[in-house]
Amino acid sequence: MNHLPDFIEHFEPLAQNYDVLLCDVWGVIHNGVTAFAPACDALLRFRKRGGTAVLVTNAPRPGEAVARILDRLAVPRQAYDTITSSGDTTRGIVASRRGQRLFHLGPERDVPIFAGLELTFAPLETADYVVCSGLFDDTVETPETYRDMLAAMRQRSLFMVCANPDIMVERGDALVYCAGALADAYVALGGDVLYCGKPHAPIYQAALAAAAAARGAATVPLERVLAIGDSVRTDLTGAAAFGIDSVFVTSGIHAEEYGGRHTPDIEALDGIFAAGGVTPIAVTRGLKW
């Protein structure tokens, strides 16, 4: 068994080693239904001590739209400096393809991702490319539901922009599929996909630029940056590839893979890290000061 990172109950002793926190949102700060008060408190305290907290999310929405969702969940805006979303990255890609017709594969609630952009929507049969923000109805559908649609896209060699690389997220006590699941299925068919969000570099570049701006600095030393998240595939892999330390939250989407949310199976947890090729500096049940 590989060396397992320290299991910590409190973030405070670790916080002094870092100036910038790149914090995941869904699964760390809330579960889609309820905000996690201890996590919000930890962010508030980190900022009070001079730290900069950037929320980095694969939500397929502009950062301000994410902020409004957090408002409704009672996450205080004082808990973070700014938000960097895969939705913002996606908007940049769409803007660069002005004049091309796009098919939006995703629910109506994600339409704000296109607000203010000059674009032309088209049905799949005549579109030039696809922006995938999720399943049309993630409460009942799975990637299998989209087998025929993805095959039709592949037949036309349509390029896909994936606005949310997450495979699944928590919604209350349930797990629902995200755009990343459809994008991966399309790649398996030989389709061409651009992933906007974690674990890919552009969103980290944007987040670090936002952190530097918030601190009034030109850059932020990577050794003073810490990422916190509940996904090995996105949060930990992305941080490792960018040379950033990470803390893994066990109460998120991987919980059932290692014995539940309260008493993780250490060997199973170590196996998940080994399979992902990552080694977080610490593991915690939840972000708590």
Language model region names:
Residues 1-25, 30-49, 56-84, 88-289:
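Asp-based, Mg2+/Mn2+-dependent phosphohydrolase catalytic module
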